[in-house]
Amino acid sequence: ESRVILESMRKAKGGYGKIECYVGVENRKDALRGANFVINAIQVGLYDPCTIIDFEVPKKYGLRQTIGDTLGIGGIMRALRTIPVMADFAADMEEVCPDAYFLNYTNPMAMLSGYMQRYTGVKTVGLCHSVQTCSEDLFKQLGMEDKLEGRKELIAGINHMAWLLEIKDKNGVDLYPEIKSKIDEKIADPEFGNKVRLEYIKNFGYYCTESSEHNAEYNMFYIKSKYPELIERYNIPLDEYPRRCVNQIASWKKEYAEMLEKGVKEHNRSNEYASHIMESIVTSTPYQIGGNVLNSNHLITNLPAEACVEVPCLVNGRGVQPCYVGALP
């Protein structure tokens, strides 16, 4: 069925390329043989039962989560059940496509990408769309859409917690003073849902890439059993993610059935990095991404060398080349 949909998409784009279908672990080497790029987007254990267990077991012991896919109990459990599968991927790739790039979209991003980079010989870069949507979402929330065009930014840190270190308009003017002048009104709005990240700006001076929903569980400031009023004050959606998954899966099934029945008439390129990386390497056309790579060259000087960091990377015919950032504030 997936092949039928892909063939429909291929025809919608003029019929270029060739689609081959391989099903099952026993056919994986044949699928990988001679590949230049391998895109990884998997969930080991699926939503049911594993995501449910990731939430329900910690909850019994008073540990509350919002997403549970990055760190903490939920993130660690995801990593532990996914790393063995990634190790099998890596072993096959080292044998049948040793020069291929492994483009990883699977969470927990830093743990899994870091594993591949530290313990396998596979060229790996981790990809997350929170970098390219970061400043645009912030500007739209603050009514600063007029500053979107031509803006210049620097984002670096670790996945889901990289920092908008610099943000300037097309003329090079620092936009943080204007941003900071607008955030108190938003934080005071009881209906506004992005308060945690705006609090970061107030207290730390910088905005963070991933959502307030994610960031609420990354530190000790917001989800506290002795201060339940913080949940309401910051609009923190505890246990919302499992419910959202149910609705999302139902929506995907409906969309899948419609594509299978009607075909795909139109397919537009998104801002996800994978296709741009492949195009840049094959055509030697420069492109910049935010990638998750090892900090072995001290790209961020005050994070450990063995850490997996999210930094600007130049992509061209030579591959993915991480850029030096320096120290985080």
Language model regions located:
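Flavin (primarily FAD) cofactor-binding/catalytic cores of flavoenzymes
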Residues: I39
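An anion/phosphate-binding loop that grips the pyrophosphate of nucleotide cofactors and donors
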Residues: A35
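Rossmann-fold NAD(P)-binding glycine/threonine-rich loop
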Residues: V44-Y119
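Flexible loop/turn segments at secondary-structure boundaries
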Residues: D30, Y47, A110-S113, C134, ...
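Short acidic low-complexity segments
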Residues: E20-L32
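Glycine-rich phosphate-binding loop and adjoining beta1-alpha1-beta2 segment
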Residues: E1-G17, R28-K29
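Rossmann-fold dinucleotide-binding core
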Residues: V96, Y101, Y105-N171
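Long, compositionally biased stretches enriched for glycine and/or charged residues
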Residues: K140-P329
